[in-house]
């Protein structure tokens, strides 16, 4: 009987210690050849950066984080030897990323000597992501090594290095582009969409999104992406421009709709945008040249 009680006791202890709260993600990190005694992880929540420093003991550390479901979490390499010093600044090393999945254990293993190659386990979304990162990680490693050579010396022939780095970037983007249609029910595909946006015609980008499953499109990020697409469609060539009104320096109200039938150049800028403000003298030159020809300027 005593043996049975002891056996049951350890079963209960194992169950308690293995539990992960349904509103947190447990992150377990295993490292090799990493010289620091902590590793930093960061993520975004509510528009703010959040972070934790995970203490390492014998190459292993763990922490529970309250990151929103499917938030991208990044492991930052704070080892100064991994950074690139360039001029008066630094170029930080690439991060290792994974997704927060509530109630799950996410295990990340990496060797600093092969950074940012990593093994990521735990949760369906990270399983999907690892299928991509398993191929992309070695390319990111190669690109980083080339960048270290590119910025380390003025004596190297930089053009071949730049071309090889550019080719790797294109290969990585192609991997992401091919992953999306093959995995329409994966949150990873939704996360990858912004990265391929600039290289695709808008119609193709929109179709990639619409081909995702309803479950993925109805997530918080999916709804946000849908809203961004709807706003972009309003400003495509050939669409009726959204009306707005502004007060000019003489106190007169100017409405875009009042200028129907005219050629109108609209310049949007912010007081914080130094390059925008530097362009104003050129804008004045354009105004002096084209305003007499019927072009209306709104700045």
Predicted features by range, described:
Residues 1-30:
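Bacterial Sec-dependent N-terminal signal peptides
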Residues 19-167, 171:
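A non-transmembrane, solvent-exposed segment enriched in polar/low-complexity residues
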Residues 91-93, 167-237:
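N-terminal targeting signals for export/organelle localization
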Residues 185-186, 260-262, 292:
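Active-site acidic short loop of glycosyltransferases
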Residues 224-256:
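N-terminal "domain-start" segment that seeds a small globular fold
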Residues 244, 254, 259, 268-269, ...:
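Conserved hydrophobic/aromatic "anchor" residues
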Residues 260-285:
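Conserved redox-active cysteine motifs that mediate thiol-disulfide chemistry
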Residues 277-299:
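Structural microenvironment flanking redox-active thiols in thiol-disulfide oxidoreductases
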